[in-house]
Each structure stands twice: as structure tokens, then as C-alpha cells.
Amino acid sequence: MLYRTLGKTGEKVSAIGLGGYHLGHPPDPADAIQIVHSAIDRGITFMDNSWDYNGGESERRMGVGLRDGLRQKVFLMTKFDGRTKDSTARQINESLQRLQTDHIDLIQYHENIRLEDPDRFFAVDGPLEALLEAKKAGKIRYIGFTGHKDPFVHVRMLELAAQHNFHFDSCQMPLNVMDAHFRSFGHDVLPRLVEQGIAVLGMKSMGDGNVLESGRVTPLECLHYALNLPTSVVITGCERMAILDQAIEAARTFKPMSSAEVSALLAKTKDAAMTGQFEPFKTATQFDSTAQNPNWMR
């Protein structure tokens, strides 16, 4: 397994992160728990989750999977949807209970996708106040944010953070071979994160499978491309053992790509990427869980 440094935190984490959303998919919870155990046995230390995934089932399954001393072997991340101080504090406490832990290593502001989301994060009685109190209490260690819609909203978040003299520890965003051509987080946000020492967490390397439907790239090419960027972690969902095997193989076979190799890969995807067809999470609303469940934010 490859290991990388998580931005300015100095934490060493696996370059492949186990996505939490897909752990809620197997009908039998034991299958999901087996995936968690196998991932740890094979060197994955970064665990991804979110308060809202599958009605909390993803966190509950991961919590069971991290019993018997395994929690101490991983770097645990989850996310929250609250847009107020009270809802954020409540969701942190619920995640701690489900994950069966006394602290979360990294917690992230989920779905920074609307133009007002950055302002709400820094507002009076907003999420940041709850996060700072939770950090002081030892419930969380690091703070980040995520989003999949438009790089402009991430840039706005970074600008507001600078105005408030606040440093984010991480930022999670789509990084894939299609993103390079359309509303590109890689072009517009990634350089700012690297410059500021904010850990880059790549997600949707295969665009929830949509990138593969283009027929232009293979799963390994998708993962290798994301690993070749200055990412600390590439998070990938694994609802079956075969998909975990694929992620492990990508880490095992990864070698830094030459500029010519990157250019050739992007050339294969350019025409397919230009309309956003294979990144529907940027153009459609069905991927915006907080928009579909506004009560989560209150």
C-alpha cells in the first residue's frame, strides 16, 4: 500500500481510502464488515463516512467493523450536513455513537455545493462554532469540507477561510479524467489547496461508474490518474470484495505518470467530457442529498 502525508497535519495515511457510502449497500451487514476488515488487513488506514449515508447504516456498520482494537489502526473521517451550530453538534454526537468511538480524526462539512454554503459555515451560530467546541472537547481532531457541484463554491470557501484567518485541514472533491475538461476542480481548486498545505481528498475517480460508461478508460486508469495528482487520499467505494481488490491492485501497480502519459489519457476523454454527460453530479440534482433532505441542515 502507498502512504502519503495528509496536508499540514503530518498524519500518514493510505493513498487509497475506503469509501463509507457503499458499505451500506450489501444486504448482509456481515459482508460490509468483512470488507472493512480486509481493507485494514491489506494496508488501508483511511476510512471515509458521513452522518447521512444510508440513514446512518454506513456509520453503524463501520463502527462494528472497527471494534476489537481496529479503531486504533485507522484514520477515521466522517462528514456532517448541519448548517447551524446546534444541528452540527447533534450530528457529531450521533456519528460518534454510531462509529463507537470517542473521537473522529477528521470531520468535514458535507456538500459545499450552493453559493451560500461557505457563508453559512462561517456565520454566527453556524457550524464552525460547533466544530471548534467539539475540537476543544477532544471529539474531533481536524476539520475539512467537501463538495461535488462547482469549483467556484470551493474557491469561495477558501477565500472566506482566509478572511476569517481559518485553515482547513482537508478538502474533498471530484478528481477524474473527465473533470480535467469540464468545471474542473483539478484546474481551479487543486493548485490553491497544494499552495496552502490543505490535504487533497479525491473522490469520484470513476464518477460513480459514469466515467467508465464512456468506454474511454479502464478502472485502473481512472485510479492511477487520481493517484498521480497531488492527492493525499483517493477515496473509492467498495461494496464488493472484487472492487476492493481492484483498488488494492491500483495502489500496487501505480507509478508516477509522465506528462506524455497524462496527455494521452486526457486526449482519450476530452470529447466525451465536454458536456458533463459522464459527471452528472455536477449538472443534475439527484446527487445533492442535502437539497433532497433540507431538514438535515436545520
Predicted regions and their residues:
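Short catalytic-loop micro-motif centered on adjacent basic/acidic residues
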Residues: T45-D52, M77-K79, R141-T146, Q172-M173, ...
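Conserved, mostly hydrophobic/aromatic
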Residues: L6, L18, M47, M62, ...
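Structured C-terminal cap/extension of enzyme domains
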Residues: A30, S38-D41, T45, H164, ...
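N-terminal binding-site loop/beta-alpha segment at the start of enzyme catalytic domains
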Residues: M1-K73, A130, K136
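A general structural detector for well-ordered alpha-helical segments in enzyme core domains, enriched
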Residues: L2, D31-V36, S58-G65, Q91-S95, ...
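Structural motif corresponding to the early beta-alpha repeats
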Residues: Y53, D68-A89, H110-I113
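Active-site mouth loops of central-metabolism enzymes
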Residues: G19-A30, M77-S87, L115-R120, V211-V217
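Glycine/proline-rich, positively charged
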Residues: R83-D188, V194-L201
